[in-house]
């Protein structure tokens, strides 16, 4: 692995990586290996801290992996950044609040050196899998307002969850 090669070649470096929360990160002290190789920050596309929403996104992530990985990083001193999305089709306001509260009510996470998070609004872009079958996500209408004729994305109407305006 990249981390093992850095250690093997005795390269003295600090580095940042972008990862997905995966069960394999929790095996064989892999996070510790990352730290020993110089990793000091990991950036994760968490997207949501709600299992139903993660499943709808087809992320293939379990919340327990998020918790366990975060705990391991905090224990070792690896800073983390979480990208979060709100307004994914079918997502409800209480589900968005699960993500917000995961961060705001987790004092240990907030106090961990270098922690950061950003919450961005979901943008349905042209060519995304949702565009091919919008009804699967409760989307009844996709459109681009005339004043956004150069937009790469869509505005949409939905029968489930929050609208794109919400």
Model-predicted segments: where are they?
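Conserved SAM/AdoMet-binding glycine-rich loop
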Residues: 1-80, 91
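Alpha-helix termini
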Residues: 7, 105-114
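Soluble or luminal CAZymes and related metallo-dependent hydrolases
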Residues: 26, 65, 95-98, 166
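Hydrophobic, well-ordered secondary-structure elements that form the walls
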Residues: 44, 82, 103, 117
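Short acidic (Asp/Glu) and glycine-rich catalytic loops that position anionic groups and cofactors
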Residues: 11, 78-83, 99-100, 147-156
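Catalytic cores of alpha/beta
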Residues: 29-30, 89-106, 131
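Structural beta-sheet core signal
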Residues: 17, 82-84, 119
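Flexible glycine/acidic-rich beta-alpha junction loops that bind and position SAM and/or redox cofactors
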Residues: 52-57, 86-94, 110-165
């Amino acid at each position: 692995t990249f981390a093992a090669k850095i250690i093997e070649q005795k390269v003295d470096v600090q580095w940042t990586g972008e990862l997905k929360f995966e069960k394999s990160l929790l095996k064989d002290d892999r996070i510790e290996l990352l730290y020993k190789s110089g990793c000091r920050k990991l950036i994760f596309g968490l997207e949501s801290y709600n299992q139903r929403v993660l499943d709808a996104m087809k992320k293939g992530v379990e919340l327990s992996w998020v918790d366990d990985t975060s705990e391991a990083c905090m224990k070792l001193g690896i800073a983390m950044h979480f990208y979060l999305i709100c307004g994914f089709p079918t997502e409800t306001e209480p589900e968005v609040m699960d993500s917000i509260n995961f961060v705001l009510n987790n004092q240990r996470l907030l106090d961990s050196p270098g922690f950061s998070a950003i919450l961005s609004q979901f943008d349905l872009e042209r060519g995304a899998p949702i565009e091919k079958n919008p009804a699967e996500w409760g989307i009844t209408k996709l459109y681009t307002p005339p004043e956004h004729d150069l937009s790469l994305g869509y505005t949409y109407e939905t029968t489930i969850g929050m609208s794109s305006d919400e």
